[in-house]
């Protein structure tokens, strides 16, 4: 399909491979040459999920949820708490109670975490 003109891409989530690009600190998936991603910062005890990005032709197809699940499953497998600075991830966590146990106590002070990360040059 011609994604350059904004034509929506057909997507089967079962065929989408999400990878953890640790060098770039992001979970990513590429569909029809278009990259979707969630950026993060990893700390010894937590994973700060910063931003989710899905190109317009792929919006509304469940790709952001697929990326979010991959990030949260990674956090669980590595015994990391999650700090969701990204509004999409925060909303996802409110809707999916099965991931509530991953929330960091710092979740309630997202602004202070964001400021701390920014002031230390991590954001």
Regions found by a protein language model. Name each.
Residues 60-71:
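Conserved acetyl-CoA-binding loop-helix of GNAT-fold acetyltransferases
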Residues 53-59:
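A short, internal acetyl-CoA/4′-phosphopantetheine-binding micro-motif in the GNAT/acyltransferase core
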Residues 2-37, 42, 46, 56, ...:
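Terminal substrate-recognition subdomain of acyl/acetyltransferases
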């Amino acid at each position: 399909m011609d994604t350059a003109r904004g034509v929506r891409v057909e997507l089967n989530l079962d065929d989408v491979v999400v990878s953890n690009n640790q060098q770039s600190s992001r979970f990513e998936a590429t569909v029809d040459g278009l990259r979707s991603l969630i950026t993060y910062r990893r700390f010894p005890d937590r994973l700060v999920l910063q931003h989710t990005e899905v190109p317009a032709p792929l919006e509304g197809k469940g790709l952001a949820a697929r990326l979010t699940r991959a990030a949260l499953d990674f956090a669980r497998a590595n015994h990391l708490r999650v700090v969701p600075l990204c509004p999409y991830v925060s909303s996802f966590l409110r809707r999916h109670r099965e991931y509530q146990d991953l929330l960091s106590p710092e979740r309630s002070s997202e602004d202070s975490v964001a400021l701390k990360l920014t002031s230390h040059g991590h954001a």
